[in-house]
Design a protein with these regions (language model features):
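Conserved, well-structured functional cores that handle cations and Mg-NTP chemistry
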Residues: 1-98, 102-129, 136, 147-150, ...
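Short amphipathic alpha-helical "interface-anchor" segments enriched in bulky aromatics
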Residues: 10-14, 103, 200-231
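Structural motif
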Residues: 32-38, 231-241
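Catalytic-loop motifs flanking and including active-site residues across diverse enzymes
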Residues: 41, 212, 239-245
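A short, flexible helix-boundary coil/loop motif
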Residues: 52, 56-62, 69-77, 81-85, ...
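Active-site-proximal structural scaffolding
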Residues: 113, 123-125, 184, 213, ...
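A conserved active-site cap/scaffold subdomain adjacent to cofactor or substrate pockets
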Residues: 186-192, 205-207
Length: 344
């Protein structure tokens, strides 16, 4: 990242698991199904830079009834707070932290952000309480219309207003909705932030990154196979998650936004473009710069090798030296592609 500041999103994800043999599986709330069910839950931290997401850290939540010898029970709040500390100690430059109401309602988590003087935008419950001195009251400002811009650059009209508890404070409270008349539950958010200044036009987009990352991670789970394991031992599950996150990171690193951060990688990419082989001439090459576009292109790069090993057993039955030679030439050409990998 070359010292560039990033936005950090804290979120938990739960996956349904049948039976009771898998480590740390219990009946608990699973966001993926929107109800309490049998499953495993992890708390995850993601980075966002220039509309590209990348994984930073994952910690499994261990319900009390599933603890093993040597385990210590930690709440999701404690796990998230540990993540913030570890990310700061790793030297990440964090310009903003986003989280849902589980963390927004936690004074422990907010204290951890304050400890590092981090800016935050967090969701809170609609019945969030604030202590007020006698004689002070709660009031709501007028609704302000703004354009909510999404990652695909499309926009929709939203409405925002500040809720003031007594006197003006360094921490401010906001309502964001699609319809100020009906306040639909599924498209109305209650938000708390320590950001200063005129936030009416910017806060909606900043907080919207959180839901966008949630959606993006669901796609990642579907595309990369986050839940496609048959292990019951958590060490094996954790290893699987690490592999998925490594692939996720590799795809993100090959996005134009992150490639451009490092001069040597930029030169390498330019050299790649000036090569006599122009991979982007492939009929199915995607020229957009989003995460799924990069994933599509990396899949095209590995296709010849995968297809070769699918066909190879048949060459024992139907020998074809020309086909074998052609595959060798094609794979050699594909090996000239220079993807970006994380250093260290």
């Amino acid at each position: 990242l070359n010292g560039q500041a990033i936005t950090v999103v804290i979120d938990e994800t739960g996956d349904r698991k049948k039976g009771k043999k898998t480590d740390y599986v219990a009946r608990q709330y699973l966001g993926s199904v929107g109800k309490i069910d049998n499953g495993i839950v992890s708390v995850n931290a993601y980075g966002v830079y220039s509309n590209i997401t990348f994984p930073l850290m994952v910690k499994v939540f261990k319900p009390k009834g599933t603890l093993k010898e040597g385990d210590k029970y930690k709440t999701k709040i404690e796990l998230a707070s540990e993540m913030i500390t570890e990310l700061m100690e790793e030297g990440f430059q964090i310009e903003l932290v986003l989280a849902d109401s589980l963390y927004g309602e936690s004074s422990q988590f907010i204290r951890k952000l304050d400890e590092y003087n981090l800016a935050y935008v967090v969701a809170i419950r609609s019945n969030h309480g604030v202590w007020l001195p006698a004689g002070q009251s709660v009031r709501a400002n007028n609704w302000c219309k703004f354009e909510r811009t999404f990652s695909n650059q499309k926009s929709e009209t939203r409405y925002i207003r500040e809720i003031i508890y007594g006197k003006k404070r360094t921490i401010t409270y906001w309502e964001i909705t699609t319809d100020p008349e009906t306040m639909p539950e599924n498209s109305t958010s209650f938000v708390m932030t320590n950001l200063q200044g005129n936030l009416k036009k910017t806060l909606g987009d900043l907080y919207g990154l959180r839901t966008w990352v949630e959606y993006g991670f669901r796609q990642c789970k579907q595309e990369l196979g986050w839940t496609d394991y048959r292990f019951t031992n958590f060490q094996h599950i954790e290893r699987w998650w690490e592999i998925i996150f490594c692939v996720y990171t590799m795809i993100s690193l090959n996005s134009p936004a992150l490639l451009a951060l490092n001069q040597s990688r930029q030169i390498e990419a330019e050299g790649q473009r000036t090569s006599h082989i122009d991979f982007s001439n492939h009929q199915q090459w995607n020229h957009e710069s989003g995460w799924k576009n990069v994933l599509n292109n990396l899949r095209l790069i590995v296709q010849p090798l995968l297809l070769f090993w699918l066909i190879y057993p048949w060459l024992d039955i139907f020998p074809n030296s020309q086909l074998l030679l052609g595959f060798n030439h094609l794979i050699a050409a594909m090996n000239q592609f220079k993807p970006c990998y994380a250093s260290g």
